[in-house]
């Protein structure tokens, strides 16, 4: 049985940990509102951009050349996985769920005879995936020093992908991130971004008004596709940021509650041990008095 000193030290240690988890929960809650607003504001813009591209694609002049960012290379040999996770941990299963989705996708492609390349955005996803795909990871992009994600961050990543695509390094690129739904629900998501996925013709027609394009649909489509890539990556980064803070807030809340339960149990053990020790000392005193 542990001594009273050991129990006091244990209780003090858990209380110190509880203060840390409570502080982290409050910080995550403060960051969550801003991150959630940014993610929710980015959604309609990204969805509208995809709808406009769908309208343009369906109205291309017959026989016009389709941009490679929409038509692809015509091959399906090399797949690039852009896996977006966090730079830090202590956010529940947020990082592992995204990495698991990417890992399963990579395994399936490998089993089908495809070549897989991986770019990790965020250190935690890299730490998980390198155990199995060390040779397939071609780059790690860290955002540790970025205080607030913005268009410039997404554009840098998009230009990286465009350069690799134009150099013929891959045929298809898939983006992995976590879509934010609520504090306790974040959905790991895979989205093909090269060649761009656009809404079906019927869906595009329902969401878009009639447009007249100048100079023509082909030129506008070619100009918008790189911007759409940046927008889709930006949306993923913002969704990830909100999901990370929601997951961390939930995880730290659970940790704080568990610490409270542990403190109660250890305090009960401490009181019982102290009571037993006092009782033992009283018995020894009484026995000594009777012996006299």
From Swiss-Prot:
Lineage: superkingdom: Bacteria
GO cellular component: plasma membrane; proton-transporting ATP synthase complex
GO molecular function: ATP binding; proton-transporting ATP synthase activity, rotational mechanism
Cellular compartment(s): Cell inner membrane
Topology of the protein relative to the lipid bilayer: Peripheral membrane protein
Gene Ontology annotations of biological process type: proton motive force-driven plasma membrane ATP synthesis
UniProt keyword Hydrolase, yes or no: no
Keyword tags: ATP synthesis, Cell inner membrane, Cell membrane, CF(1), Hydrogen ion transport, Ion transport, Membrane, Transport
Calcium found in the keyword field: no
InterPro entries listed in its UniProt record: ATP_synth_F1_ATPase_gsu, ATP_synth_F1_gsu, ATP_synth_F1_gsu_CS
Subunit structure: F-type ATPases have 2 components, CF(1) - the catalytic core - and CF(0) - the membrane proton channel. CF(1) has five subunits: alpha(3), beta(3), gamma(1), delta(1), epsilon(1). CF(0) has three main subunits: a, b and c.
Entry's family note: Belongs to the ATPase gamma chain family.
Function summary: Produces ATP from ADP in the presence of a proton gradient across the membrane. The gamma chain is believed to be important in regulating ATPase activity and the flow of protons through the CF(0) complex.
Name recorded for this polypeptide: ATP synthase gamma chain
Native source organism of the sequence: Methylobacterium sp. (strain 4-46)
